[in-house]
Amino acid sequence: MLRIPVRKALVVLSKSPKGCVRTTATAASNLIEVFVDGQSVMVEPGTTVLQACEKVGMQIPRFCYHERLSVAGNCRMCLVEIEKAPKVVAACAMPVMKGWNILTNSKKSKKAREGVMEFLLANHPLDCPICDQGGECDLQDQSMMFGNDRSRFLEGKRAVEDKNIGPLVKTIMTRCIQCTRCIRFASEIAGVDDLGTTGRGNDMQVGTYIEKMFMSELSGNIIDICPVGALTSKPYAFTARPWETRKTESIDVMDAVGSNIVVSTRTGEVMRILPRMHEDINEEWISDKTRFAYDGLKRQRLTEPMVRNEKGLLTYTSWEDALSRVAGMLQTFQGKDVAAIAGGLVDAEALVALKDLLNRVDSDTLCTEEVFPTAGAGTDLRSNYLLNTTIAGVEEADVVLLVGTNPRFEAPLFNARLRKSWLHNDLKVALIGSPVDLTYTYDHLGDSPKILQDIASGSHPFSQVLKEAKKPMVVLGSSALQRNDGAAILAAVSSIAQKIRMTSGVTGDWKVMNILHRIASQVAALDLGYKPGVEAIRKNPPKVLFLLGADGGCITRQDLPKDCFIIYQGHHGDVGAPIADVILPGAAYTEKSATYVNTEGRAQQTKVAVTPPGLAREDWKIIRALSEIAGMTLPYDTLDQVRNRLEEVSPNLVRYDDIEGANYFQQANELSKLVNQQLLADPLVPPQLTIKDFYMTDSISRASQTMAKCVKAVTEGAQAVEEPSIC
């Protein structure tokens, strides 16, 4: 087992009655008193010197130490003096003892740090003017603050050959100071043992031993944790300096997790995307698709309205002409002749505006691309389609049953939580579905959905495991609900969850049943009353079809009458735009203030980082203008007014960064028994089986050259996308 952080390693362990190892919190009366530069502070036993110093606001320099990684203690930059101790100690690895007086700025501490810094700089190249880490480099900052003012090293510096670890991370290994943060991240957080050290002493190198790609959906995070410029972003190389960019706090919409991000822009262009701390969602990590797919925001964009001419070709036109044509069709056709499909990247403001517009023409055929069973309780109960336990709540669970999902590629940050709990809390995981690499061990129960019946009836051995669990979770992937027996699968999972609550020691507040969504718009659409799936449109093909960012290919021209008038509103010329008669260019998530609801039901906002390209406009504004031209004006003119309308329809949509607990009623399970559908024998196979299936899943990532390089590198090897080095 990996070495866990010192603080956790020293927590008292106790055996539960059932033999499980549990951690016990330290009582307040057991706190010990230590002194930091003469200032008293009370800390728990096992607290390190560095943590005690931080508690009183004293920052200790460090390179190898990271709060979310195990303690390595190999950079020695955090050396401090302990009063009456013979030698300085490494603050990150030394637990405090009662009565210690820690001297952080004594002559001995300063001299020790100067010596360590001198050794670190002895072989470090003077690359600062051409290094992408310049301006946000820990080595720059700490050498300025804690280092000497001159160098005594006159010999030649060592040089290390760079490693090719894929199309995302650029390596300049001569700059590496062997802090091993990247190695520990790879093995502990990402769960991929691709990185390690070879050699010793002055010959030590960090790399992959044999040349291979760093195969992880979280690989870009090693760029952030690298304290020097040894690991930088290949797509961002030599494009901008940190002080030249404007930072905008926003959220990611590439999956349904809703990771918090910072969008860095310059001169109206997105230069890079970085993670933003949110302990309850993504902590401080983001997936590679979130980080690197931003170049897709400037490719294949729809920048002007377009209409199909008499020759069947799409030609540019004015907003007035395009909206007038659409308005004419809405005035001609009413009721069931008008329908709409919402795509995976659509915000809540656009969803409610489109809903209001179609209601004005007496139509309620508003559908989502993703299917969700409506039989039984269906979408009437919010708890039926949410990750009720929450993402952070995974760390409290003791047993997790995954059904028909591959969270590693469907929701990488949710999977990282599962791994974290498995690593530190002895979480037991089981999977029903295709055997996949989840980066942690699990019990594979099989791939047949009929196993759910056995678990529900109590005849399966895993039923006993769930029964004995204190806080079990059943996580059903939304991809499993796209099947013809989706309603039966949902009913079976609901039955399992209800029986666990009745027979085990689950408390009233703990939610057992969870749905893991894959797309960012699904929860908000269901909250607003959209019908999941396009079956209603296939059964009753409309005369006018409005595709709002619908690029999933769930419906084609062949599914519709030849005279069906199709409007596509979105930001990329992907799957939906080519079949449209009118194209209305919309804004992407970095170009608008918009509301999205993640898989746990948490509403969050994107913020405007750049302006939309060309004549593109925000989606709700386009729909509002269309309603006015069609003579059915919607009653809102500003973003605040649209959000007031959102609050009228579903109040939780404007309670930002708050989760409204969804009650799971027993009636939901009773209604699920009315589902008249049988489980199929077909195996549960998630659509994103391997990392190759992870990179290009929506209109933005499909337009990204960086994501295309990743797919090529995975299938053909990292050498297939290797570019000549400039530096």
UniProtKB/Swiss-Prot annotation:
Q: Which cofactor does it need?
A: [2Fe-2S] cluster; [4Fe-4S] cluster
Q: Which organism is the protein's source?
A: Pan troglodytes (Chimpanzee)
Q: Which GO terms describe its biological process?
A: mitochondrial electron transport, NADH to ubiquinone; mitochondrial respiratory chain complex I assembly
UniProt similarity note: Belongs to the complex I 75 kDa subunit family.
- Residues involved in [4Fe-4S] cluster 2 binding: C176, C179, C182, C226
What are the top taxonomic ranks of the organism?
A: Eukaryota, Metazoa, Chordata, Craniata, Vertebrata
Where in the cell? Mitochondrion inner membrane
Designated name of the protein: NADH-ubiquinone oxidoreductase 75 kDa subunit, mitochondrial
- Which residues form the organelle targeting sequence per the record? 1-23
Q: Where is the 4Fe-4S Mo/W bis-MGD-type domain?
A: 245-301
Q: Kindly list the residue ranges recorded as spanning the membrane.
A: none
Summarize subunit and interaction data from the UniProt record for this chain: Core subunit of respiratory chain NADH dehydrogenase (Complex I) which is composed of 45 different subunits. This is the largest subunit of complex I and it is a component of the iron-sulfur (IP) fragment of the enzyme. Complex I associates with ubiquinol-cytochrome reductase complex (Complex III) to form supercomplexes. Interacts with MDM2 and AKAP1.
List, alphabetically, the SUPFAM superfamilies matched.
2Fe-2S ferredoxin-like, 4Fe-4S ferredoxins, Formate dehydrogenase/DMSO reductase, domains 1-3
Q: Where N6-acetyllysine occurs, residue numbers?
A: K84, K467, K499, K709
Give me the residues that bind [4Fe-4S] cluster 1, please.
H124, C128, C131, C137
